[in-house]
Every structure is written in structure tokens, then in C-alpha cells.
Swiss-Prot record:
Compartments where located: Cytoplasm
GO terms for cellular component: cytoplasm
Entry's family note: Belongs to the RNA methyltransferase RlmH family.
Designated name of the protein: Ribosomal RNA large subunit methyltransferase H
Top-level division of the source organism's lineage: Bacteria
InterPro entries: Alpha/beta_knot_MTases, RlmH-like, tRNA_m1G_MTases_N
Native organism taxonomy: Bacteria, Pseudomonadati, Pseudomonadota, Gammaproteobacteria, Oceanospirillales
Catalytic activities: pseudouridine(1915) in 23S rRNA + S-adenosyl-L-methionine = N(3)-methylpseudouridine(1915) in 23S rRNA + S-adenosyl-L-homocysteine + H(+)
Source organism per UniProt: Alcanivorax borkumensis (strain ATCC 700651 / DSM 11573 / NCIMB 13689 / SK2)
Pfam family, one: SPOUT_MTase
Length: 160
């Protein structure tokens, strides 16, 4: 199983890269986690809508390439209004996908969020929190929760 975090932004602070990499290296080969960064389009003055659409175009283009390599991949848009999952529910989702050999692509937008049309085209929409989270933090938080979900599936003592 392959977990792909497809995210807008390429210049993250060192703590974000270090945090993501720490959980990425803990994941087993049969549930590999990768990060695919999409460069943030140049920001115009005050037009968040066009920025979000440009980001969506870039995400969609890369997503099409991923889905060609893994036709059954499930896409999940991460957004504040998505379905809230607790750690056990996330772990069960991972287990279900792993059991059928389905890859998972998680979409993370830029500072202004995901384009509603891109979000609507995903198989599911999940929320990590009711709080508004900075998109760099989402990378670390999500990597940790994916690792924690795997530890629940395997009985690893990380989650107590």
C-alpha cells in the first residue's frame, strides 16, 4: 500500500521537514508514505479565488499522473468541513484500504484551502480538526496520525 500526501508548498521550515521525515521513516515498506510537494503558484494581490484555482489545477495534474500509475487509488481531500475521524476510525480506514490493496492520496491545499471543485471530486473529505491548522503543520500531524493508525493495526505499543 502506498500513502501519498500531495501538498501545496515546497519551502517548509526545517521542523516541518524533520517531523514529517521522522514518521515517514517509521512506516513499514508495505504501507509506504511519500510526500509530493507542488510548487505554490505565484500569489496575486487579494485574489484568493484565482490562487486556489491555480493550486487546484496543479494538484489535479499531479493527481492524474498518480492515478494512472495506481488506478484504484482513493483520493481524500483534507478540509476543515470534512468528516472528523478519530484515531481508531483512521486506523480502520487504513486497514480496509490495505486489505484490498488500494493506495491512498491525501490532498492538502495551500494557505487558503482547497478549491471546492477539487474537494468535491475526491472520494472522501476528512477533517483533522475543527481548528484551522496552518498547512505546514498538517503535514506533520497527518504523518504522525498515519503512523499511529498503522501501530494500532499491528498492535505496536506506540499507541497506548
Amino acid at each position: 500500500m502506498h500513502l501519498v500526501l500531495l501538498a501545496i508548498g515546497t519551502r517548509m521550515p526545517a521542523w516541518v521537514t524533520e517531523g514529517f521525515n521522522e514518521y515517514q521513516k517509521r512506516m513499514p515498506p508495505d504501507m509506504r508514505l511519500t510526500l509530493e510537494e507542488i510548487p505554490m503558484p505565484k500569489r496575486g494581490k487579494g485574489d484568493a479565488g484565482s490562487q486556489i484555482r491555480a493550486e487546484a489545477d496543479a494538484l489535479r495534474k499531479r493527481l492524474e499522473t498518480i492515478v494512472k500509475k495506481s488506478p484504484g487509488a482513493k483520493t481524500v481531500a483534507l478540509e476543515v468541513n470534512g468528516r472528523a475521524l478519530d484515531t481508531h476510525a483512521l486506523s480502520r480506514k487504513l486497514g480496509e484500504l490495505k486489505d484490498v490493496g488500494q493506495d491512498l492520496v491525501l490532498l492538502v491545499g495551500g494557505p487558503d484551502g482547497l478549491c471546492p471543485e477539487l474537494s468535491a471530486s475526491a472520494h472522501e473529505r476528512w477533517s483533522l480538526s475543527n481548528l484551522t491548522l496552518p498547512h505546514p503543520l498538517v503535514r506533520v500531524l497527518l504523518a504522525e496520525q498515519l503512523y499511529r493508525g498503522w501501530t494500532l493495526l499491528t498492535g505496536h505499543p506506540y499507541h497506548r
